[in-house]
Amino acid sequence: MKPILPLALLLAACSQQPAEPTLTTGVFAGKGSGDRLCIAGEPGNYRGGLIVFGDGDVNCSASGRIEVADATLALVPRGEGECRIPLSIDGGAIRIGQVPAACSYYCGPGATLSGNAFSLASQAQTRDGSPAKAVDLAGDPLC
């Protein structure tokens, strides 16, 4: 009878793990006309991408997986070991926190990710009236 008690306690402890939060997926628009963030996938397998423009066509752009740990989110660019772009959900907006120096590779001179905010762009359209999309400078999808 004694071996059953530790097994029961172990199973009870495992069942109390918090589930990964469900994120709203789709395209989010930033303050600039081309600033976009996208989230796709499902819990445990989210991916994301973003592009933020500075002056002219100078920009920051990255895509990869969305890492969820405790109450924090981060975009981890593909092939990256050190860069974690911190994200937070603030009501209906997604905000980028203070981006570490390890992520500077993803920005051109004068462009920055830190402090940008994005709102769900379900009805947002581009200048020519087409639906908003999250694409890089070459037109390739970020998600």
Each language-model region and where it sits:
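Sec-dependent signal peptide recognition
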Residues: 1-8
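Tryptophan-anchored aromatic micro-motifs
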Residues: 20-37, 117-127, 131-142
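C-terminal motif of bacterial Sec signal peptides marking the signal peptidase cleavage site
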Residues: 11-13
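Surface-exposed, polar helix/loop patches in the mature regions of secreted/periplasmic/lumenal proteins
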Residues: 81-129
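Contiguous, well-ordered beta-strand patches that form the walls/edges
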Residues: 54-100
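Bacterial signal peptide processing site
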Residues: 15-17
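Short, hydrophobic/aromatic-rich segments at coil-to-beta transitions
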Residues: 20-29, 44-49, 68-76
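N-terminal glycine/threonine-rich, aromatic-flanked beta-hairpin/loop signature
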Residues: 36-69, 142
